[in-house]
Regions:
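Hydrophobic transmembrane alpha-helices and their helix-loop junctions in integral membrane proteins
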Residues: 90-107, 113-132, 141-445, 465
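Cytoplasmic/organellar membrane-interface segments at the starts of transmembrane helices
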Residues: 361-367, 418-514
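Hydrophobic alpha-helical membrane-insertion segments
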Residues: 32-47, 170-178, 371-379, 452-471
């Protein structure tokens, strides 16, 4: 039944052009119903999964090879699937308002975007290694089509090809790693590999680790494979808002979290992930504050966030896993809101250049509220989900026996730069006096353009007040699933350790000074 419903979602996706022709401006709302329905179904699984009982489904796929299309939803899969479907539904609504009914590519866009949502949903719920790889490659192909949607432009074609070459090459590495993992362990389901406690010191085990990490690094744009992500900003903003905040770039992080129980005790795990994550985190944050285009600022802060997630998983501690889970959710919410708000600003003013944008608040109050809510969360200001993520990150650094000081300095530095980037996007563009030489005449936008940003921006704040339910229903199950063992991932608005509060205050004060 699950597989049939997933296939039906792909079928609906390819009916996107017809749906647009038949229903016009209502097509985006109708197509958004598919991911919204998946989201609603996933919510019904929360009690079961939070009690530690995974949801499973399996269909015989290739009987002669004993290959099954198997699916497995535990705490980690559930969290990612909720992000994929929830943000996906909002993006579908946003897309119609952003592109308009006269955009000649909109029918194909609906098809590609809904198919991408379905592929991501399949990827984060897949248990079988072959099934996971099929969905992984589908996301690469569909991202190529989405980034190159306006193929009349050379930049769009070039950026789409660059993304496909880098992520496609990583996909080949991943295939090799998954095959080695399946053959050496004798298991082809990720849950079975984890439960078997399979590990090894053989060369083949190390090779599998390296190849899987390479696949993840290319998908999640770790240095030196990061170039495709900023260049992909030539894509329409709905593509950037989904692929580059909540979906595609998180696929590599999800994969690393999924194989964490198998690989994290091997010395190569930390040697690969920690340097890559640290360099990506700092370089992304530094380049972000040197941009003057809203989307490129967001692209580089996304790089920094992906580096942070890779770094946390590479540390190999329970607290770091907890921090990674919280940061993953927080980033998806505030970054999705910021990308969509940036698109709304571009739609209303005709520019994303922060040197020209001034005094948007009076003409775009709802969009301004949305971008402010999300930017404050990105800056890690209390009382937001972004603040909880920063708090757990700092606590993970304090917990380390060795390397802690370096990590803490790096965490504070990236936090300072993130706050500076958030300020660049909000203070002058929204609240300064309009400049006569930049007579932009910003105007209000339709509900489709502000609904997604305001929902995600408000969630970045509202969820921070629900630390008890969030800890019980989402953070603890997701962190436990990623670690492969029970983790009590309680969240606190006021940190238990005064040192965490002091470091957080230092980060904010330094960011304000910058």
């Amino acid at each position: 039944m699950f597989l049939a419903a997933l296939i039906a979602t792909f079928g609906l996706a390819f009916a996107g052009p017809l749906t647009h022709r038949l229903t016009g401006r209502w097509a985006n709302w109708l197509l958004a119903a598919a991911p919204a329905a998946w989201f609603a179904w996933l919510i019904t699984l929360v009690p079961q999964v939070s009690d530690g009982e995974a949801w499973t489904a399996s269909v015989e796929w290739v009987p002669s090879l004993d290959v099954h299309a198997s699916f497995y939803i535990d705490g980690l899969s559930l969290l990612m699937a909720l992000i994929v479907t929830g943000v996906g539904a909002l993006i579908m609504v946003y897309s119609g308002a952003y592109l308009g009914t006269t955009e000649r590519h909109i029918g194909r866009f609906y098809a590609f975007m809904l198919a991408f949502i379905a592929a991501m949903f399949g990827l984060v719920t897949a248990d079988n290694l072959v099934t996971l790889f099929v969905f992984w490659e589908l996301t690469s192909i569909l991202s190529f089509l989405l980034i190159g949607l306006k193929h009349d432009y050379a930049d769009a074609r070039k950026s789409a090809q660059q993304a496909l070459v880098i992520t496609g090459g990583g996909g080949l590495a991943l295939l090799g790693g998954l095959v080695i993992l399946g053959v050496e362990s004798g298991q082809w389901e990720l849950s079975a590999i984890r439960d078997s406690g399979f590990s090894g010191e053989a060369v083949s085990f190390a090779a599998a680790l390296i190849l899987v990490a390479l696949g993840a690094f290319t998908k999640s744009a770790q240095v030196p494979f990061h170039g495709w992500l900023p260049n992909a900003m030539v894509a329409p903003t709905p593509v950037s808002a989904y692929l580059h905040s909540a979906a595609m770039v998180k696929a590599g992080i999800y994969l690393l979290a999924r194989v964490y129980p198998t690989f994290h005790e091997h010395e190569l795990w930390s040697w690969l992930l920690v340097p890559a994550g640290l360099v990506t985190m700092l370089l992304g944050a530094w380049f972000a504050i040197r941009q003057d285009d809203l989307k490129r600022i967001l692209a580089y802060t996304t790089l920094s966030a992906l580096g942070t997630l890779t770094l946390l998983l590479g540390l190999g501690t329970e607290y770091a896993v907890k921090a990674a889970v919280v940061f993953l959710a927080a980033h998806a919410l505030y970054k999705g809101a910021l990308f969509m708000a940036a698109g709304a600003i571009d739609h209303a003013t005709g520019t994303r250049d922060i040197t020209r944008l001034r005094g948007l608040w009076p003409g775009m109050p709802i969009t301004s509220i949305a971008i402010s809510l999300a930017a404050v969360s990105m800056a890690g200001i209390p009382i937001t989900l972004g603040y909880l993520a920063k708090e757990t990150f700092l606590a993970a650094g304090l917990e380390l026996d060795s390397g802690g000081p370096l990590l803490l300095v790096s965490a504070v530095a990236s936090g300072v730069l993130a706050l500076a980037a958030a300020s660049l996007m909000t203070i002058r563009p929204l609240f300064s006096r309009p400049a006569p030489e930049h007579d932009l005449h910003p105007h209000g936008v339709s509900v489709g353009l502000w609904l997604g940003p305001i929902v995600l921006g408000a969630a970045s704040w509202g969820l921070a007040f629900l630390t008890g339910p969030i800890s019980t229903w989402f953070a603890t199950p997701a962190a436990s699933a990623a670690a492969g063992s029970p983790i009590d991932a309680k969240l606190y608005l006021i940190p238990e350790d005064p040192a965490v509060l002091a470091l957080s205050a230092l980060t904010i004060l330094a960011g304000v000074a910058v």
